[in-house]
Amino acid sequence: MNQSGSNEQGGTGGVSVWCVMHGLRMLVASLASLIYWVVGGLLFVIAGLVCVPFLPGETSRALGQWLLQGAFRTFLLLLRVLGVLRVEYRGLDKLRDSTGGLIVAPNHPALWDAVCVIARIEGLRCILKASLLHNPILVGGATLAGFIPNKPVHKMVQRSIEALRQG
């Protein structure tokens, strides 16, 4: 600070308007994201309760994957509109054009890569941590989309082989 009470960058040491606006935008984005996940999770639970018992396995799985992909695309669009996230896909489109079974193994520190990959590639059968099937927000979409729990391991391997053979 200099003698006039301002710092060397020209500010007064207080909170700038930009910081306040950024904080408000992040608060709105956080609340919107939370609401989106909770409402979406509940809708997927309802969809799972309705579709899984009444639609054949492949039909309900295809519907679940389509709905989940749309939900993730919409979520990423929401975050982009709010100005908190921008996703660039490089090389991922090549995977969409491949034929036959394919293993995609993202290494996600915060589930973002799973959201981005599912939003971009159709018909994925994901292997997920079995405990996530106890999460009321995630269980509906994961079950409806035919995701494969990672435990027990021998069943995970069997289901994964079946999914690869189906393409």
Task: Describe the residue ranges of each PLM region.
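Soluble catalytic domains of membrane acyltransferases
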Residues: 81-167
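Non-catalytic C-terminal accessory region of glycerolipid acyltransferases
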Residues: 2-23, 27, 96, 154-167
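A transmembrane-helix-recognition feature enriched in membrane-embedded lipid enzymes
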Residues: 15-88, 140-141
